[in-house]
């Protein structure tokens, strides 16, 4: 018997949803993927129009449900939700527990330390993840070395409100920047690797070293800014996006006086590449500042790019020069067996969620009450009005119960703090 689960990733340029079958062995098989634009409803990862976001959620899940019904499944009425927003970042925390006389840190002590981190209460913030970097003993105390993934409460609450409006149960809120780290190898996590998830409006900076996450920041800057710059040359936004993807080269190759065909404007390739590279150099400068802030300047052995923006031509060359990292590669999700088309970098966040999705998201059939069954057996019929009332009473949406709490400092005041 297979389990049907579902995931929705709320990105900066698109909302992506997947329906997934899980067999008895725990293997995931993607049944369908659907995407829609976030324009007008989500900005920098935060919901700005609850009604419109809910409508797009309903539309996506209806499409997924129609796909899986061909295999005998029911409707999808729940989903895991992946979120990322500009307020999301890591924060060090050091919980402590008094040890017994043997001064031994066992699993029970580790669990107590982790629970303390989850229960940390700070006004207006959520804790979305806890990463342990180890423990040490100070006198008679076991002290945890934790990285908390935190964000403003409005980030997750906006998603909960939209899901409630769409009448879809939230199984769990997942911080996708933390999950995307699974695309790295153990060796990369051990030896200082910069992971850049490059979206339209957001760029997530994660630094891994000594086997785990050491630093995470989400910048409110993305590759959409390049599209806007190109559009100022007299192009529509969608045409500017196509020009950026198909012709732009951030490495600024020598193109002479060559121009792009099939355009109503005369835009030399050399000028286009200056536009593309200038904006990406600005992004690279901000990334470099965050590396310095994390005290990893000159200490990174490699860089891995993912996300839709990572496919920009010439980007690896530009970042190699700007960040002084020689080993740079682009990668999609590879930690679960998927079709090659599902491994593309722009789907990495969605695909990275799936190994964490284990609960059924399939709507349960509505059972008839004993009284209703008896009435049918006696050959009597209820009025349409009564039937509608019974149906409304029978179908109840489960309550959304997500734990709240967490911390993140004022974004722009904290973003560049400590950088000379």
Predicted regions and their residues:
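Nucleotide/phosphate-binding catalytic cleft detector across ATP-hydrolyzing
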Residues: 1-14, 18-193, 269-272, 294, ...
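A short acidic Gly-Thr/Ser loop motif
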Residues: 8-14, 84, 187-188, 195-202, ...
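Short amphipathic alpha-helical segments
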Residues: 19-21, 93-94, 207-209, 316-319
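A structural motif specific to WD40 beta-propellers
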Residues: 31, 214-216
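Helical "lid/coupling" subdomains associated with nucleotide-phosphate turnover
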Residues: 44-52, 58, 172, 182-184, ...
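Amphipathic coiled-coil signal-relay and dimerization helices
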Residues: 90-92, 206, 217
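Long, charge-dense
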Residues: 103-124, 231, 236-253
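Short acidic/histidine-centered micro-motifs embedded in hydrophobic/aromatic stretches
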Residues: 176, 246-247, 306
């Amino acid at each position: 018997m297979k389990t049907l689960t579902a995931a929705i990733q709320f990105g900066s340029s698109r909302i992506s949803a997947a329906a997934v079958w899980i067999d008895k062995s725990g293997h995931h098989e993607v049944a369908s993927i659907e995407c829609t634009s976030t324009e007008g409803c989500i900005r920098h990862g935060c919901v700005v129009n609850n009604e419109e976001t809910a409508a797009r959620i309903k539309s996506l899940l209806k499409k997924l449900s129609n796909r899986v019904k061909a295999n005998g499944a029911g409707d999808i009425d729940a989903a895991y939700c992946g979120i990322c927003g500009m307020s999301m970042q890591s924060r060090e925390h050091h919980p402590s527990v008094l040890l017994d006389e043997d001064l031994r840190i066992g699993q029970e002590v580790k669990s107590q330390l982790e629970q303390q981190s989850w229960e940390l209460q700070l006004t207006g913030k959520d804790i979305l993840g806890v990463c342990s970097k180890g423990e040490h003993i100070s006198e008679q105390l076991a002290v945890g070395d934790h990285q908390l993934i935190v964000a403003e409460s409005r980030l997750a609450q906006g998603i909960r409100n939209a899901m409630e409006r769409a009448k879809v149960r939230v199984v769990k809120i997942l911080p996708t920047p933390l999950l995307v780290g699974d695309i790295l190898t153990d060796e990369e996590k051990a030896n200082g690797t910069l992971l850049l998830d490059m979206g339209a409006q957001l760029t997530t900076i994660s630094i891994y070293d000594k086997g785990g996450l050491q630093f995470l920041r989400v910048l409110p800057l993305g590759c959409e800014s390049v599209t806007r710059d190109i559009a100022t040359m007299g192009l529509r936004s969608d045409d500017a996006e196509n020009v950026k993807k198909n012709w732009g080269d951030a490495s600024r190759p020598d193109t002479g006086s060559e121009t792009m065909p099939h355009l109503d404007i005369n835009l030399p390739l050399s000028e286009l590449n200056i536009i593309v590279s200038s904006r990406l150099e600005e992004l690279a400068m901000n990334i470099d500042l965050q590396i310095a802030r994390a005290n990893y300047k000159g200490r990174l052995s490699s860089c891995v790019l993912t996300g839709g923006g990572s496919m920009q031509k010439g980007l690896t060359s530009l970042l190699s020069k700007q960040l002084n990292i020689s080993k740079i590669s682009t990668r999609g999700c590879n930690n679960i067996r998927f079709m090659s088309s599902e491994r593309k970098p722009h789907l990495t966040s969605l695909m990275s969620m799936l190994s964490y999705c284990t609960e059924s998201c399939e709507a349960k059939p509505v059972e008839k009450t004993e009284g209703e069954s008896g009435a049918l057996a006696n050959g009597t019929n209820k009025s349409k009005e009564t039937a509608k009332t019974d149906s409304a009473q029978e179908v109840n949406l489960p309550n959304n119960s997500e734990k709240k709490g967490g911390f993140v400092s004022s974004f722009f005041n904290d973003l560049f703090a400590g950088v000379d």
